[in-house]
Amino acid sequence: MGRLGAARTWIGARSSLPREVYVLGLVAFCVAVGFGVLVPVLPVFARSFGVGNTEVGAVISAFALMRLISSPFCGWLIKIFSERIIMATGIFIVAISSGLAGISRSYLQLLALRGVGGIGSAMFTVSAFTLLLTSVEAGVRGRAAGFFQAGFLIGGITGPAVGGVLAAISLTAPFFFYAGTLVVAGTVGLVLLRRRSAEPTETAESVVSFRAVVSDARYQAACVTNLAQGWTSFGVRSSLVPVLVVELLHRPASWTGIAFACAAVVQTIAVGPAGRFTDTVGRRPAMILGGTVAAVSIMAVPFAPNIWLLIVVLCLYGVASAFLGTAPAAAVGDVAGSRSGTAVAVFSMCSDIGAIIGPLVAGLLADTLSYAAAFGAGAVLMLVAAALSWRMPRDQRLSPKNGRSRGGPSKGEMHESTATE
């Protein structure tokens, strides 16, 4: 039932979303399947070169670090070449680097190729998200972001299962499978996505300067929320929950995978309702609700007395993540308008910063203080994000059919009025 519900969520809202959203969702699925196949074997493959855990961690960090460093340049590249070209180029860069990584003859070769892959990943992420936000009307941005998120989630659920089979064949097989899925994803994007028109989709919205975007309370709240989500998901949940399951709950490590899989299924099912809530009720309440529930649920993790309650808490966090994956993205599109490459790049960087710093701080707090302190830091950051979301101007309720507010001003008028509040 879980996978059936997830599939229904992923293919819902056919009447209101343009073709670009479906293509990007398919691309996201292909990328996530390959990534899910590779991630479990990457540390083991790195260890096969006779290196220690620090060097293994560097292979993981190199990808994230190069994503962070190269993200600021992606907005500039998009302005010159278009989202479609940069997205496909980025995907092919990751495909080539991943395939070559599978035949690496030394640790340094593997490290360098993963760094190159991080550059391609940044190009794909920023360009795909920019294209997603600028291809839809404001009234369906939440649902579009939810569909895109669901593509990643379903792929992420499927990938590890395929990866287990491939890893039994060879440690290098997942690298080639990942490269293959990326080639498919890049080709799909090039063939099925339309060339960018001369005029942006939303002609009523004027091009907004990046300085104006940064000063907008909605963008500030979205960026802090993305930072908190990167910190909490990667820094706290992914790095400490596996240790907590083994050391505090005294369960086999396999239970971590079961718990994460349950949470991912719940999150996938929740993205559809979260997207509709974001579009009909508003970005502001969705971000406040998501941030608050995420803070409470992540704080409850170290106090879970058994594995079953831990799974429930992680599923609750998955529901919150569904809201935090749709509402902030829609808010960025509302603020930046068309051709929002630089704004999306900075928004993406916030998550990367959280993902890089979060594991270090969480591990330090867990070692020097307690697990409760480590999870508490993530909860506090989530509450800060919710508080900043409270400062956002109250949303106009948008009609999904035409992107106009019900009983209010048009999109262009609404953008102008809310930006000055």
Task: Give residue spans per PLM region.
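Short amphipathic helix-loop junctions that connect adjacent transmembrane helices
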Residues: 41-53, 239-254
